[in-house]
């Protein structure tokens, strides 16, 4: 196949055999968010480039290296969204839905785009589910977001495989004081830092704390600590969050080097990490961004949120063997009909079954075929039962019901009793 007819590197198709797991995961998250009172918002995948420069920060890796940016026919610079928070903030500002202190608890799902080196668990087009809350500034809402994700891990059966890491970045003023102290310390040890950290020292020194270079990490052992520069309000907020997590029985560790890769965070930051996926260990991350709305032209409005990577969490479910067997069955019943009159009766019967059993997953054979070929297709479909309708059954207004996945003989069931019989048989299968 020529290159022009292949998917772009790092942008993957989700094939039919993969879709049930995606639907299961997305449905589980959406259902949980509904129970917590969150409303869905949908934003475009393309925004003006300036939005991300103002929100994420011009000297971040995302803006400098990773964004898909292009000029449209009007000469405007546009960018495929690399993350969801900025677009969500833009939307609530544009439509005025956080005015007068109105609380908004929102969630979204969709594709994000970053030009990174593709590897296991990291792609150029990837999917996120994110949550954003506006106009609530206490540690209680921070705790709710973390408790919500902890409950999700329980529903998915992966609580034992993830760990919560917490930190507080304080206010922008506190970070500025810390930044000055950190720059002074590291400038005196510049030659001991890796090349990337030397570059970041001038542009975004807090990101050096997250360096993976062992020599840089050795230097950081003696560096000033962010917690020593926190303002009192941030300290109280962080203690309040930890107290609530303790009360909820959610284990956590403090990671003083956790700073996140986006400039807009303040006070609480957190990550859920796993050691089951190799280097790509973060599956969910978030924090507070109390100054972002004002920074983007709105009135002072507090914000807090998180985003989770769907690809990584699905990979984690597969790695741990936590994929429910039931989701791989697409069809409950496969109807085989032999002869034109049986086919016509089968169509009427199948639609009657759909009326009476709205959740029934029923496939009707298409394209005709012999008994052997139709039965082979029924078995291959993964259905629990085959319905068999021929001239003999048609004359008696009956239909054959044959188990495909377990023990049991074929039974002939009267048409008017079929719906009730099927419902019971599927429930017991």
From Swiss-Prot:
InterPro entries hit by this protein: aa-tRNA-synth_II, aa-tRNA-synth_II/BPL/LPL, Anticodon-bd, Anticodon-bd_dom_sf, His-tRNA-ligase, HisRS-like_core, HisRS/HisZ, HisRS_anticodon
GO BP, one annotated term: histidyl-tRNA aminoacylation
Cleavable signal peptide: none
GO molecular function list: ATP binding; histidine-tRNA ligase activity
Keywords noted in UniProt: Aminoacyl-tRNA synthetase, ATP-binding, Cytoplasm, Ligase, Nucleotide-binding, Protein biosynthesis
EC number, as in UniProt: 6.1.1.21
Record flagged with keyword Protein biosynthesis: yes
Entries under CDD domains matching the protein: HisRS-like_core, HisRS_anticodon
Catalysed reactions listed for this entry: tRNA(His) + L-histidine + ATP = L-histidyl-tRNA(His) + AMP + diphosphate + H(+)
Any single Gene Ontology cellular-component annotation: cytoplasm
Highest taxon of source: Bacteria
NCBIfam families named among the record's database cross-references: hisS
Family in the record: Belongs to the class-II aminoacyl-tRNA synthetase family.
PANTHER family: HISTIDINE--TRNA LIGASE, MITOCHONDRIAL-RELATED (PTHR43707:SF1), HISTIDYL-TRNA SYNTHETASE (PTHR43707)
Protein's recorded name: Histidine--tRNA ligase
Lineage of the organism: Bacteria, Pseudomonadati, Pseudomonadota, Gammaproteobacteria, Pseudomonadales
Name of the coding gene: hisS
């Amino acid at each position: 196949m020529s290159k022009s007819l292949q998917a772009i590197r790092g942008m993957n198709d989700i094939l039919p055999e993969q879709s049930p797991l995606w639907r299961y995961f997305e449905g589980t998250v959406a259902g949980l968010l509904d129970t917590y009172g969150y409303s869905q918002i949908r934003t475009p995948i393309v925004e003006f480039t300036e939005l991300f420069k103002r929100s994420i920060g011009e000297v971040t890796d995302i803006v400098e290296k990773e964004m898909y940016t292009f000029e449209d026919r009007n000469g405007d610079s546009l960018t495929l969204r690399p993350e969801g928070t900025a677009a969500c903030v833009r939307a609530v500002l544009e439509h005025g839905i956080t005015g007068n202190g109105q609380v908004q608890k929102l969630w979204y799902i969709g594709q994000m785009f970053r030009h990174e080196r593709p590897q296991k668990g990291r792609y150029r087009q990837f999917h996120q589910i994110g949550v954003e809350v506006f106009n609530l500034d206490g540690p209680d809402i921070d705790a709710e977001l973390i408790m919500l994700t902890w409950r999700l891990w329980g529903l998915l059966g992966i609580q034992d495989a993830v760990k919560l890491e917490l930190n507080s970045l304080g206010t922008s003023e506190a970070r500025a004081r810390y930044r000055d102290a950190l720059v002074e310390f590291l400038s005196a040890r510049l030659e001991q830092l890796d090349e990337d950290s030397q570059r970041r020292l001038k542009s975004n020194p807090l990101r050096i704390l997250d360096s993976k270079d062992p020599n840089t990490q050795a230097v950081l052992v003696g560096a000033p600590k962010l917690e020593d520069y926190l303002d009192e309000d941030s300290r109280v907020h962080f203690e309040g969050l930890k107290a609530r997590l303790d009360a909820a029985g959610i284990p956590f560790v403090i990671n003083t080097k956790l700073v996140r890769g986006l400039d807009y965070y303040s006070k609480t930051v957190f990550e859920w990490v796993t050691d089951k996926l190799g280097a790509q260990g973060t599956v969910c991350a978030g924090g507070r961004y109390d100054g972002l709305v004002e920074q983007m032209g709105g009135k002072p409005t507090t914000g807090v949120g998180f985003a989770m990577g769907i690809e990584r969490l699905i990979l984690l479910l597969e790695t741990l063997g936590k994929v429910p067997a039931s989701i791989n069955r697409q069809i409950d019943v496969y109807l085989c009909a032999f002869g034109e009159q049986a086919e016509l009766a089968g169509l009427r019967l199948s639609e009657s079954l759909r009326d009476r059993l709205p959740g029934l997953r029923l496939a009707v054979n298409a394209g005709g075929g012999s008994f052997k070929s139709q039965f082979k297709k029924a078995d291959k479909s993964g259905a629990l039962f085959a319905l068999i309708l021929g001239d003999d059954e048609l004359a008696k207004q009956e239909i054959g019901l044959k188990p495909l996945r377990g023990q049991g003989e074929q039974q002939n069931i009267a048409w008017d009793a079929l719906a009730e019989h099927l419902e019971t048989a599927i429930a017991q299968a």
